Protein backbone atom coordinates (compact mmCIF):
# COMPACT_ATOMS: atom_id res chain seq x y z
CA UNK A 1 0.00 0.00 0.00
CA UNK A 2 1.47 3.32 -1.05
CA UNK A 3 0.53 6.56 0.65
CA UNK A 4 0.93 9.82 -1.17
CA UNK A 5 2.86 12.62 0.51
CA UNK A 6 0.83 15.83 0.49
CA UNK A 7 2.34 18.50 -1.76
CA UNK A 8 2.67 20.96 1.12
CA UNK A 9 4.56 18.39 3.16
CA UNK A 10 6.94 17.73 0.27
CA UNK A 11 7.47 21.46 -0.21
CA UNK A 12 8.40 21.85 3.46
CA UNK A 13 10.85 18.93 3.25
CA UNK A 14 12.45 20.52 0.19
CA UNK A 15 12.53 23.91 1.93
CA UNK A 16 14.44 22.42 4.87
CA UNK A 17 16.78 20.55 2.51
CA UNK A 18 17.55 23.68 0.48
CA UNK A 19 18.12 25.80 3.58
CA UNK A 20 20.19 23.05 5.18
CA UNK A 21 22.44 22.68 2.13
CA UNK A 22 23.06 26.43 1.99
CA UNK A 23 23.64 26.60 5.76
CA UNK A 24 26.15 23.76 5.63
CA UNK A 25 28.04 25.46 2.81
CA UNK A 26 28.07 28.75 4.72
CA UNK A 27 29.30 26.94 7.84
CA UNK A 28 32.09 25.26 5.88
CA UNK A 29 33.07 28.62 4.34
CA UNK A 30 33.51 30.15 7.80
CA UNK A 31 35.69 27.18 8.82
CA UNK A 32 37.88 27.65 5.76
CA UNK A 33 38.15 31.39 6.38
CA UNK A 34 39.45 30.82 9.93
CA UNK A 35 41.66 27.82 9.03
CA UNK A 36 44.86 29.81 8.30
CA UNK A 37 44.75 31.36 11.79
CA UNK A 38 45.56 28.01 13.49
CA UNK A 39 44.22 29.24 16.82
CA UNK A 40 43.81 27.06 19.91
CA UNK A 41 40.48 28.77 20.56
CA UNK A 42 37.80 27.50 18.10
CA UNK A 43 36.82 30.90 16.73
CA UNK A 44 35.00 29.56 13.66
CA UNK A 45 32.48 27.59 15.70
CA UNK A 46 31.97 30.43 18.15
CA UNK A 47 31.42 32.79 15.22
CA UNK A 48 28.75 30.66 13.54
CA UNK A 49 26.97 29.94 16.81
CA UNK A 50 26.78 33.60 17.86
CA UNK A 51 25.95 34.88 14.36
CA UNK A 52 23.42 32.10 13.87
CA UNK A 53 21.80 32.89 17.21
CA UNK A 54 21.56 36.56 16.27
CA UNK A 55 19.98 35.70 12.93
CA UNK A 56 17.60 33.28 14.65
CA UNK A 57 16.40 36.17 16.81
CA UNK A 58 15.92 38.42 13.78
CA UNK A 59 13.99 35.82 11.80
CA UNK A 60 11.96 34.78 14.83
CA UNK A 61 10.54 38.29 14.93
CA UNK A 62 10.20 38.66 11.15
CA UNK A 63 8.67 35.24 10.44
CA UNK A 64 7.03 34.05 13.66
CA UNK A 65 6.00 37.19 15.55
CA UNK A 66 5.30 39.65 12.71
CA UNK A 67 4.51 37.17 9.89
CA UNK A 68 6.35 39.40 7.40
CA UNK A 69 7.41 36.37 5.34
CA UNK A 70 5.43 33.31 4.32
CA UNK A 71 5.59 30.45 6.85
CA UNK A 72 7.63 28.31 4.44
CA UNK A 73 10.56 30.67 5.09
CA UNK A 74 10.67 29.42 8.68
CA UNK A 75 11.56 26.02 7.24
CA UNK A 76 14.10 27.40 4.77
CA UNK A 77 15.85 29.86 7.10
CA UNK A 78 15.28 28.90 10.72
CA UNK A 79 15.13 25.10 10.50
CA UNK A 80 17.24 24.46 7.40
CA UNK A 81 19.82 27.22 7.00
CA UNK A 82 20.41 28.17 10.64
CA UNK A 83 20.07 24.57 11.80
CA UNK A 84 22.93 23.57 9.51
CA UNK A 85 24.92 26.79 9.97
CA UNK A 86 25.13 26.62 13.76
CA UNK A 87 26.74 23.61 15.34
CA UNK A 88 26.25 22.26 18.83
CA UNK A 89 27.97 18.95 18.07
CA UNK A 90 31.19 20.59 16.85
CA UNK A 91 31.10 22.92 19.86
CA UNK A 92 30.78 19.87 22.13
CA UNK A 93 33.67 17.89 20.63
CA UNK A 94 35.93 20.95 20.48
CA UNK A 95 35.23 21.63 24.16
CA UNK A 96 36.05 18.03 25.05
CA UNK A 97 39.28 18.06 23.00
CA UNK A 98 40.42 21.28 24.66
CA UNK A 99 39.74 19.78 28.10
CA UNK A 100 41.43 16.45 27.33
CA UNK A 101 44.51 18.14 25.88
CA UNK A 102 45.07 20.01 29.14
CA UNK A 103 43.69 23.35 27.97
CA UNK A 104 40.94 23.34 30.59
CA UNK A 105 40.96 27.12 31.00
CA UNK A 106 40.38 27.60 27.28
CA UNK A 107 37.70 24.88 27.36
CA UNK A 108 35.81 26.58 30.18
CA UNK A 109 36.06 30.01 28.58
CA UNK A 110 34.92 28.52 25.26
CA UNK A 111 31.85 26.91 26.82
CA UNK A 112 30.94 30.07 28.73
CA UNK A 113 31.53 32.27 25.67
CA UNK A 114 29.33 30.09 23.44
CA UNK A 115 26.44 29.96 25.87
CA UNK A 116 26.54 33.57 27.09
CA UNK A 117 27.24 35.18 23.71
CA UNK A 118 24.74 33.04 21.80
CA UNK A 119 21.89 33.67 24.22
CA UNK A 120 22.80 37.36 24.39
CA UNK A 121 22.82 37.52 20.59
CA UNK A 122 19.28 36.12 20.41
CA UNK A 123 18.04 38.59 23.01
CA UNK A 124 19.71 41.59 21.36
CA UNK A 125 18.44 40.55 17.92
CA UNK A 126 14.86 40.15 19.13
CA UNK A 127 14.87 43.50 20.94
CA UNK A 128 16.45 45.36 18.00
CA UNK A 129 14.28 43.72 15.37
CA UNK A 130 11.08 44.37 17.31
CA UNK A 131 12.03 48.05 17.47
CA UNK A 132 13.01 48.27 13.79
CA UNK A 133 10.14 46.42 12.09
Curated annotation (Swiss-Prot):
How activity is controlled: the entry says: Na(+) is not transported, but it plays an essential structural role and its presence is essential for fluoride channel function.
| Binding of Na(+), residues | 83, 86
Asked if the record carries the keyword Transmembrane helix, the reply is yes
Which controlled-vocabulary keywords does the entry list?
Cell inner membrane, Cell membrane, Ion channel, Ion transport, Membrane, Metal-binding, Sodium, Transmembrane, Transmembrane helix, Transport
UniProt keyword Manganese, yes or no: no
Transmembrane region positions?
5-25, 43-63, 76-96, 108-128
Subcellular location per the Swiss-Prot or TrEMBL entry: Cell inner membrane
Pfam families named among the record's database cross-references: CRCB
What this protein catalyses is: fluoride(in) = fluoride(out)
**GO MF, one annotated term:** metal ion binding
Q: Which InterPro entries match?
A: FluC (IPR003691)
Membrane topology summary: Multi-pass membrane protein
Q: Which domain of life is it from?
A: Bacteria
Fetch the HAMAP family from UniProt. FluC
NCBIfam families, per database record = crcB
Functional description taken from the UniProt entry = Fluoride-specific ion channel. Important for reducing fluoride concentration in the cell, thus reducing its toxicity.
- According to UniProt, the name of this protein is Fluoride-specific ion channel FluC
Q: Which organism is it from?
A: Saccharophagus degradans (strain 2-40 / ATCC 43961 / DSM 17024)
Amino acid sequence: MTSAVPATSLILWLAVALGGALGALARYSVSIAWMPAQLKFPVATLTVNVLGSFLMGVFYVVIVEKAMLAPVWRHVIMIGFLGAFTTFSTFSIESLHLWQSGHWQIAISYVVANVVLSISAVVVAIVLTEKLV
